[in-house]
């Protein structure tokens, strides 16, 4: 399953999504969801996570400093097209 995380750590619904994710699920941090990687990296530790690069950079963070895989918007569309199920 593809799980889109749009809001930051203050959102209980997004926390539930991350806690419910299985090792097979692909999590994509979009918009303010990128703050999980910065403020609460332990919440995504051991999970298959990617960050939307333009969203990271729009919030003033460097792509070079990021240790997680990055995708652009075209890559996000590809993930959506390839996924049989998604949660957003």
Region annotations inferred by a language model:
Residues 1-2, 88:
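Absolute protein N-terminus
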Residues 2-14:
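Short, glycine-rich nucleotide/cofactor-binding loops
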Residues 12-13, 34-39, 57-61:
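Short, charged/polar "capping" segments at the starts of alpha-helices
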Residues 19-23, 39-46:
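Short, conserved loop/helix-junction motifs that constitute active-site signature segments
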Residues 26-32, 48-55:
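Short internal beta-strands
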Residues 44-47, 67-69:
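Short, hinge-like loop/turn segments at secondary-structure boundaries
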Residues 61-88:
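C-terminal structural segments of small proteins and small subunits
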């Amino acid at each position: 399953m593809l799980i889109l995380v749009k809001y930051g750590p203050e959102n209980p619904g997004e926390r539930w999504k991350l806690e419910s994710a299985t090792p097979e699920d692909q999590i994509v941090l979009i918009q303010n969801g990128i703050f999980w990687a910065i403020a609460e990296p332990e919440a995504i530790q051991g999970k298959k996570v990617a960050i939307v690069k333009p969203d990271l950079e729009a919030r003033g963070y460097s792509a070079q400093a990021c240790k997680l895989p990055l995708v652009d918007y075209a890559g996000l569309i590809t993930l959506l097209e390839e996924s049989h199920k998604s949660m957003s």
